[in-house]
From Swiss-Prot:
Modified residues (Glycyl adenylate): 90
Keywords: Molybdenum cofactor biosynthesis, Nucleotide-binding, Phosphoprotein
Pathway: Cofactor biosynthesis; molybdopterin biosynthesis
GO biological process: Mo-molybdopterin cofactor biosynthetic process
Record function comment: Involved in sulfur transfer in the conversion of molybdopterin precursor Z to molybdopterin.
Gene: moaD
Entry's family note: Belongs to the MoaD family.
Gene Ontology molecular function: nucleotide binding
Source species taxonomy: Bacteria, Bacillati, Cyanobacteriota, Cyanophyceae, Synechococcales
Modified residues (1-thioglycine): 90
Keyword Phosphoprotein (UniProt): yes
Subunit structure, as described in the record: Heterotetramer of 2 MoaD subunits and 2 MoaE subunits. Forms a stable heterotetrameric complex of 2 MoaD and 2 MoeB during adenylation of MoaD by MoeB. During catalysis MoaD shuttles between the two heterotetrameric complexes.
Protein name: Molybdopterin synthase sulfur carrier subunit
Length: 90
């Protein structure tokens, strides 16, 4: 089964989506959060050793109600997800 998920990219990951707009992505289900990151990298033609690809791998994937770790399955019912890069504060 394939679903379309709209990705909202924050911080340095905003460079993945044209003009900072939400980015639609076709995803084959079942898929984990790690599978989603691979699909994003492919869709954006990221070289594995690029800074943006490395940032994507360190980033969290979130919905309105939770954060998904790499081993979590992405529910078929989700239509929007956020890409959240690591941040530091002080």
């Amino acid at each position: 089964m394939t679903t379309t998920i709209t990705l909202i990219c924050f911080g340095g990951l905003a460079a993945l989506s044209p003009e900072g707009q939400p980015m639609p992505l076709e995803l084959d289900l079942p898929a984990t959060a790690a599978d989603l990151k691979v699909a994003i990298a492919r869709a954006c033609d990221l070289m594995p050793d690029s800074a943006l690809a490395q940032l994507l791998q360190k980033s969290a994937i979130g919905s309105e109600t939770r954060i998904y770790i790499d081993s979590d399955l992405i529910p078929a019912s989700l239509s929007h997800l956020a890409l959240l890069p690591p941040v530091s504060g002080g």
